[in-house]
Regions:
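Small-molecule-sensing regulatory modules
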Residues: 2-7, 13-15, 22, 34-112, ...
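Low-complexity, intrinsically disordered segments with a bias for serine/threonine
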Residues: 16, 25-29
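Short, well-ordered beta-strand segments
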Residues: 59-61, 95, 134, 152, ...
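N-terminal glycine-rich phosphate/adenylate-binding segment common to multiple enzyme folds
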Residues: 108-162, 168
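A conserved helix-loop-strand patch within extracytoplasmic ligand-binding domains
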Residues: 138-139, 147-199, 246
Length: 364
C-alpha cells in the first residue's frame, strides 16, 4: 500500500549559518565586496533551508468554528507529543474547510439534509489529497463512511452530559410555563417536551459563542449545550447546572472526537491509530450500531449512551421519541465490554425499539 507522507531531507540551519573565520596569517585579505557576496549567499541558503522546515508533514482538515479548532488543536498536540518528527516547527498544518452546515444557518438541520452536513466537504478534501487527516465530532459523522476513508481513532471521550444555561433559573424544572428554550437538536427538544410539556422549544443554531450571545440578548430564556464542548473551550463558567443522563440522554457519540484518513495511507493510519482510546472506540461503536439499526437521521430524535460500569461491563441505554415528546421509547442492555458483544447490544436494542414503535413511528 502506498504511504502518502513525505519526509523532506532537512539540513540544520545552524550548520549552514556557521562559517569559519578567515585565517589572518599567510593570506591576503579578501576584498570587502567578495566577503559581502559570500554572506548574502549564506543567508539566502539559510532562508531556503528554513522554508524547507516549514513544509508540513501532515495536514489536518477541520471546520472553522472555535470548538472544531479546539478539537483540531487537541489532535495536533497529541500527535506532536507522540511523534517527535511532528513536533518540528511547521510539521503539522491545520486547514479550515467550510461545510454545508456552516453555510446554512437559518434553517433547522433536518430541513437541509440531516447527517453529513458537517463532514461531506472535509471528506472530499481528504479524498483529493488537500488534507491528510480529518478531525470530526463523532456525533456529526454519518453511520456510513465514504469509500476509501477509514476512521481508526477515537480520542478519550469528554463528559457526555448536557449543560443547562439560563440567566434567571437554575434548572428546566424551574422555568415557568411558556418559557422558550433554544435548541437545534430534536433529541433535546423531544426529551424537554416529554418532561416539561408546558415549555416551548425553538430552533436555535450557531456555534457556542453565537448561542450564548443570543441567550444574553433575550432571544430565548434558556438553552442546552453539550458540556464536552464547553469544557474544550474553557467556557464552563457559563454553565448554570448539569443535566444527568437520566434526565437528558446524550446524542449518539456525544463528547467523542474521531480522526479519519485515507484507507490506503499507511503512514497516516499509523500516526492516528497510536492515539486511539479503545474504551471510547468501543462505546462509540455500540452507540452507532444502535443508530445504524434505526437508520436514524436528523429528523428522528434518537439518543444513546454506552459506558463501562464499576464491574467492567458495558451498559447501554437507547431512546427514540416523537419530535413533540408525546411518545418516548427506551431500552437498555448490559453485557461484556468487547467489540462483538457491544455491536450486538446496539443492534439488538435498535431492533427492539423498531418492533415496539411500529413502522409508522419513524415517519415524521
Amino acid at each position: 500500500m502506498r504511504a502518502a507522507t513525505h519526509h523532506p531531507l532537512i539540513a540544520s540551519p545552524a550548520d549552514i549559518r556557521s562559517g569559519r573565520s578567515w585565517p589572518s596569517s599567510g593570506r591576503t585579505a579578501l576584498p570587502s565586496n567578495v566577503r559581502k557576496v559570500s554572506l548574502v549567499t549564506r543567508a539566502t541558503v539559510a532562508v531556503e533551508q528554513e522554508k524547507k522546515v516549514k513544509v508540513s508533514l501532515l495536514k489536518i482538515g477541520t471546520r472553522g468554528s472555535p470548538l472544531a479548532l479546539a478539537q483540531a488543536h487537541e489532535t495536533r498536540d497529541k500527535l506532536m507529543a507522540s511523534h517527535p518528527e511532528l513536533a518540528e516547527d511547521g510539521a503539522i498544518e491545520i486547514i479550515i474547510i467550510k461545510t454545508t452546515g456552516d453555510k446554512i444557518l437559518n434553517q433547522p438541520l433536518a430541513d437541509i439534509g440531516g447527517k453529513g452536513l458537517f463532514t461531506k466537504e472535509i471528506d472530499e478534501a481528504l479524498l483529493d489529497g488537500t488534507i491528510d487527516i480529518a478531525v470530526h465530532s463523532m456525533k456529526d459523522v454519518p453511520t456510513y463512511f465514504p469509500d476509501k476513508i477509514t476512521l481508526p481513532c477515537n480520542l478519550p471521550r469528554e463528559d457526555v452530559r448536557d449543560a443547562f444555561i439560563c440567566l434567571t433559573k437554575s434548572s428546566l424544572a424551574e422555568l415557568p410555563a411558556g418559557s422558550v428554550v433554544g435548541s437545534a437538536s430534536l433529541r433535546r427538544q423531544s426529551q424537554i417536551l416529554h418532561r416539561y410539556p408546558s415549555l416551548k422549544v425553538v430552533n436555535f443554531r450557531g456555534n457556542v459563542q453565537t448561542r450564548l450571545r443570543k441567550l444574553s440578548e433575550g432571544e430565548v430564556h434558556a438553552t442546552l449545550l453539550a458540556l464536552a464542548g464547553l469544557k474544550r473551550l474553557n467556557m464552563t463558567e457559563n454553565v448554570t447546572s448539569i443535566l444527568s443522563t437520566e434526565e437528558m440522554l446524550p446524542a449518539i457519540a456525544q463528547g467523542a472526537i474521531g480522526i479519519a484518513c485515507r484507507g490506503d495511507d499507511d503512514s497516516m493510519i499509523n500516526y492516528i491509530a497510536s492515539l486511539n482510546h479503545e474504551e471510547t472506540r468501543l462505546a462509540v461503536a455500540c452507540e452507532r450500531a444502535f443508530l445504524t439499526e434505526l437508520d436514524g437521521s436528523c429528523r428522528t430524535p434518537i439518543a444513546g449512551y454506552a459506558y463501562k460500569d464499576a464491574e467492567g461491563y458495558c451498559v447501554f441505554r437507547g431512546l427514540v421519541a416523537s419530535p413533540d415528546g408525546t411518545r418516548v421509547l427506551e431500552t437498555s442492555r448490559r453485557g461484556p465490554y468487547s467489540l462483538d458483544d457491544m455491536l450486538l447490544m446496539g443492534k439488538d436494542a435498535g431492533k427492539e425499539l423498531i418492533a415496539t414503535g411500529g413502522p409508522d413511528f419513524f415517519r415524521w
